Amino acid sequence: MREGEPEVWAETPAVDLQGSGRKPGSRQFRGSSPTSLSAMIGPGEPGLFERMLGRENMLKALRAVETNRGAGGIDGMEVGQLRGYLKEHWAGIKERLLTGGYEPRPVRRVDIPKPGGGTRMLGIPTVLDRLIQQAIHQILSPIWEGEFSEHSYGFRPGRSAAQAVKAAQGHVNAGKRWVVDLDLEKFFDRVNHDVLMARVARRVNDRRMLALIRGYLKSGILAGGVVEARNEGTPQGGPLSPLLSNILLDDLDRELERRGHRFCRYADDCVPRARDEPMSSSGAQLHNR
């Protein structure tokens, strides 16, 4: 057992889940099997999808979910119940993921007040879907991270809002005192799924990965006891949404760079700056696009 790892990861004799009489997807959150979750996850294989499901990546994802905690999704499972559930059901979950039979659950809608008025919608995934999204994020993020614009600060490793503010102040000190406020109103709610998936497919050719990501985009939202179909948007609340937003908005970053503008973007907040007022016409052109 890895030093500092909770006892649940200790190597113990494996059992035959197929002969246990329990369905892998059954609603039972407390696992009683002595099977080592570490052993069940397995060593993984070299393909992109197999790397996502590999032992080390899944363990890292689980630790991230447990560290971030957060509320449960529509099934009522809490983060503290996840390890026991995985020990009982991971073999079946992994099989369904590998064969394309896994279906993400709808997210639970939560509306939170915004400082300036109005509300922001969050979509809270189940903790199991949060785990899988985190595992996807960890595999896909390095593919794009080296390509993202230096002017993008939101939801990126080693970058922060404080750094974005410092960079913006640097633009002011350099004499770029005209500011254009790019309005990306309700960006997360209006993302076109086909456009987004086309951007992802530029760098990912694993059809299973693409299908799983699209499954999360279309998983639906539970609000008022009714599941609403989702044909657009990628609601905030899961680990995958921030990365997908940066992938889509990278085109905006590249267009601003092509025009020679200095700017700072943090998620859907973007503030280009210029020395002269005429840059406002560029802002209007970008808005119309």
What is each residue range found by the language model?
Residues 1-87:
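Non-catalytic, polymerase-adjacent accessory regions of viral genome-replication enzymes
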Residues 89-92, 96-111, 115, 139, ...:
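Conserved polymerase palm-domain catalytic core
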Residues 127-128, 132-135, 169:
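Duplex nucleic acid-engaging cores and interfaces of nucleic-acid transaction enzymes
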